[in-house]
C-alpha cells in the first residue's frame, strides 16, 4: 500500500472535520450547525459526509484515493458503537466499554480506535497528561505479609440517593481482595468487622497498612498547650491488632498507598455501572453481588501471583476474637453490683465463686453483633442485649 505524508495543516483540518461529522452523526449537532462550524454550505457539508462514509478519515484529506482503506470500519458499526455508549454505557470508562463491546456485543475493535472515536465525538473527555514517572514500591513476597484496609465514599449504588462507604481489605503481594462490603459509614466497628472476617478466613497476618483516620491512630497531640497532658492511649483497632501481634503501619499520604488508590480508581469507574446494569438497588443485593460476582472477577482479572508460593498467614491459636474485636471500656462496679454504661444500668448476676464485685474494676465489651458483656479477668460475668437486658445461656450461644 502506498504511503502518504500529508502536511500538518491538512491533517489538522481533517481532524476538525472528522470531529464535527462524528458529533453530527451522534446527534449532538444538527447538520446545518456542523456546516456553520466548518464555514461551508449545506451542500458542501453533504459532500463531506458522503466522503467520510465512503472513504473514512483518509477521504477527508485526499479525495483522489481510488478505493476505500481495507481497514476502514463501516459507518454502521461506528453508529452502533456510539449509540451503545450514549444510550447504555454512558457512564463507563473507555477500557470498560471496550471490553463490553467484545464480550457482550461481539464487536472487536482496537482499544485505541474506540478511544479515539469516543473522544472525537465528544462522548468522553480527553485524558490528562501523565504525571512524572515514579518508581514502584516492590511488593511483599508472601501472602499475608502486608494487608491494606481502606474505605471509599462514593455513589456506589447509582439508584440510591447519597453516598455509600465501601470497605476493602487488599493483599500487597497479589492485589487479591479478601473482603469488600458496603456500609453506611466507615468507623471502628465496621473496620473491625472487616479485619475479623479476614482473620477468621485466612489467619493472622503480619502487618496492616492504613491511612491516618482517627479510628486507626490517635491524631490529637497530647502535649499541645490547649490539651490535657495525659498521654494518648492506643485506639481500639491498635489495641486489637496488638493483641494479635499485627503491626500497624500508618501511611501519611495517598501516594504511599498507591496500590489501594489505583484499586479505587478502577472500581469507581466500573462497579457502579455494573450495579446499574444488573438493576441492583438495595444494600443487601449490592453486597451479595460484591461477594459472589465482583470479588471473583477482580481476583481473576487483576491479581498477580506472589513471588513466593508460601503464606505468611498464621492459624489462630485459641485467641478469643469475640473479645479482641470488641470495643473495650473500663468501669468500676457499684455497691449494688451494677455498672453504668452508655446510659444503661447493667446488673451483674450472682456468681458462685465471689460474693460481690463491688468496687472491682471490670471491662465492658461492646461486641460487633450489638451485644454487651462484662469481663473480670478471663471470666464473663454477664452478657446483655443492646437494651441492657441480661441474656440467658441459650441466648448467648445463639
Region spans (language model):
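Basic, flexible linker segments flanking DNA-binding modules
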Residues: 56-155, 226-232, 311-321
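Mobile genetic element proteins and their domesticated derivatives, centered on retroelements
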Residues: 20, 34, 45-48, 56, ...
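Charged alpha-helix within mobile-element recombinases
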Residues: 230, 236-308, 312-324
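Intrinsically disordered, low-complexity and often Lys/Arg-enriched segments
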Residues: 1-10, 392-398
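Mobile-element integrase/transposase regions
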Residues: 76, 107-108, 119-177, 184-206, ...
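C-terminal, beta-rich DNA-binding module of retroviral/retroelements integrases
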Residues: 292-398
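Acidic/histidine-rich, metal-coordinating catalytic segments
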Residues: 195, 199-229, 251-254
